Every structure is written in structure tokens, then in C-alpha cells.
Amino acid sequence: MVGLRIAPPLALRRPTRLVQRNLLVYRRSFMVIFSGFFEPLFYLFSMGFGVGALIGDVPLGDGRSVPYAVFVAPALLASSAMNGAIYETSNNFFYKLKYAKLYDAIIATPMSLQDVARGEVMWALMRGSLYSIGFLGVVGLLALAGLGLISSPLGWLAFPAATVVGYAFAGAGMAATTFVRKWRDFDFMQLAIMPMFLFSGTFYPIDAYPAAVQTFVQLTPLYRGVHLIRACTTGSLDATLLIDLAYLVALGTIGLAITSRRLGKLLLS
């Protein structure tokens, strides 16, 4: 009896080849991929447990209060997913595009520009997911030690939520990188990333801001990611999470479309 092998659709098969290529490149230095994982982890221990011991409980939007570490942990998970996606779609993507001329060679094969964009987003999403898995692994170990940071049985939803965050920043980061001309232009990207990390409800509720500033913060992608993951880990689920999901998926998809068009202009003109 001949077994049937179901091949993935072409729209996924070709981008997967690019993911396989990246895996081969990193096979001897795989720990480099985890370089950005440690920053949010250090913040968790220093801010969540260190400063948290001085602060006490923090109010949530639904009237409940949780320990400061429980408040901060989901925000740092969102930041970890963001870091993994941004690291891969900024400097690494720029090097392959401008200096290694990797994509000039790839588009000489049956792969299209859309395949290139999808493949790099898939790879960035994989890196962001690895960061999230590592972070959640540490959270799990802390739970075994009696330092539980997830207060809801729905906390497992934090991982797929972090994956959506990674997708949003992968698409947006790669689209932004197609407009970068020189290495120093990445300083402008950091001017967006660092304030988002500090002020998007990561370390304290945005109720501390004036109403106009709160509205502005709510428009940022990291706030949407923080709000989504925090709702999963604390059990504060409501209809506003659909807005978070729609926002993040739309951002990633629009970024992917812009990247495909920009690659056409950069590589074919």
C-alpha cells in the first residue's frame, strides 16, 4: 500500500525554504538567536520582584488588584515577542538586503518577492516565538518555586497572543527596514521602540497619564500586545480584546504587503 504524502500549499512551501536556509545559517550559533531574550528577563527580576517588593499590589482595569510582578510579567512577555521579531527584521534583514545581496539571488529562482517577505516574517515569528517560549519557561519554573506570575487558568492563551504580537512587529519592522538607507538610520527605529517599551503600560497602568496621552498610548502596537497578554494571564477577558487582535493582525498584514512592494522597487528597479 502506497502512503500518501500531503504537500503544503505553494504559498507556504516556498517561504518555508527561506526559513530552512536561515536555520542552516544559525545551526552552529543557535544561541545567538536568544540574545534578546535576556533583556526582558532581567527586567522581570529587577523590576517585577525587586521594585515590586516595595510597591505592593497594582490595580487592574476591572477593579481587582494583583502583585506587581504579576502585573509586569505579561508586559515583558509582549516585549520579548517584540524584541525577537524586531531584531530579525531590522539589522539582519537589512544586511541580507543591502550587503549580502541574498534576495537578488533568491528572486532568480521560482521564489517571488511575496515568498521572500512571507519567509522572513515566518522566520522572525519563529524567533519571537522562541523568546516567548523561553520567557514562559522561566515563568513556569518560578511557579514551581511558589512565585506564580499567572493568576488565571486561561494563562496558556498568553503564548498564542504573544505569537500575534510577534507577527505584528515582524511585518511592521520589515516594512520599516525597507526604507532604511544606512546603518545609522536604525537609531530612528530605536526612538520608536524604546519609548513604546517604557510607556505602553509595561511597568505601570496608563491611568497615570492625562486623557490625551492615554489615547495616544492606546494607539501603539505594544500597548495592544500588553493589554492582550495581560488579559490572558489575569483572566480579564472582554470584547476589547477583539480590537487588540484585529489591530495586531492588520499591522502585520499591512507591513507584509508594504514589504513586498518595497522589495519590488528595491530589487527590480
Features from the language model and the residues they span:
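Short amphipathic alpha-helical coupling elements at transmembrane boundaries
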Residues: 17, 21-25, 91-98, 104-108, ...
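Hydrophobic alpha-helical transmembrane segments of multi-pass membrane transport proteins
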Residues: 42-47, 68-142, 191-197
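Transmembrane helix-boundary elements of multi-pass transport/secretion proteins
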Residues: 25-97, 128, 147-158, 208, ...
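Alpha-helical transmembrane segments and their short interhelical loops
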Residues: 113-190, 236-260
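Transmembrane helix-loop junction
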Residues: 52-53, 79, 95, 109, ...
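Alpha-helical membrane-protein architecture signal
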Residues: 12, 16, 20, 27, ...
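Transmembrane helix segments
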Residues: 177-219, 223
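Aromatic- and glycine-rich beta-strand/loop motifs that create alpha-glucan
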Residues: 2-39
